[in-house]
Amino acid sequence: LQQQPAKRKADITDCQSIIENHKGQRHRQQEVIESKQTAYFELIAQSTLNKHQQHHYYDVGSQVNVSFGVVRVANIMPCVDLTQYLLKRDWPENTEVRVMAYHSQQVLLLRSLQERHLDKVLKRKEKPGEIPGALNVPVIRQHLTTIKNLSPKIENVLFILVATPVEEVGRDHDFDWAVIEPSSYRSIIQLAGRVKRHRQGEVSEPNITLLQYNWKGIRDHH
């Protein structure tokens, strides 16, 4: 193992400031919970930008930097709330995001269509330096073309999947990077296995971010 190139490296996103900023407040008050959640979601958003900057590739057709990442959250409601937050957030002027929620309580037909789409986009087996096959998927190509036509200043496009543990089992997906809300060692290992799952080549910068605390730990801390 020591002779194998490191395909995955991880860093930790510090969440202590959220606890410090809400110390002494009534942690069960709805406005305090919402304030904590907004701060937590903002840390996640910043982490996605950091990982994109380190692990994107250049699409010649649209002339933008593209990456496909996953944010793993423990529960369905935070998954939905985070997806809405990322969609509404003010991103840098040169950055555009496409965000999709993926969890077990979606309508079965929708989930089936969604999984077929994800399987098509995320079966990444290109070699280092090769153009990702995902860029030839019509839906992805259409997104990139539309973004560039409507906003010529855009230089970065992040495709973000916000997923519950349903992503950890039975899916043969390959992401460029991941942001993980921790639950257990097993869940971390399972999700980390979806980063550069099939592609070879060592990474120099961390392509996985672990959040220091999970949402429940921050929400209930007082």
What is each residue range found by the language model?
Residues 79-81, 108-113, 169-172, 187-190, ...:
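Switch/connector loops and helix/strand junctions flanking conserved nucleotide-binding motifs
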Residues 185-208:
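Conserved SF2 helicase motif VI
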Residues 171-184:
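A short beta-strand element within the Helicase C-terminal
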Residues 8-9, 14-161:
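Conserved C-terminal RecA-like helicase domain
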Residues 95-97, 174-176, 203-207:
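Short glycine-/polar-rich loops that comprise or flank the Walker A/P-loop
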Residues 1-2:
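Post-DEXD/H (motif II) to motif III coupling segment of the RecA-like Helicase ATP-binding lobe
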Residues 200-203, 209-222:
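A conserved SF2-helicase RecA2
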Residues 85-90, 176-178, 194-195, 222:
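Short secondary-structure boundary/capping segments
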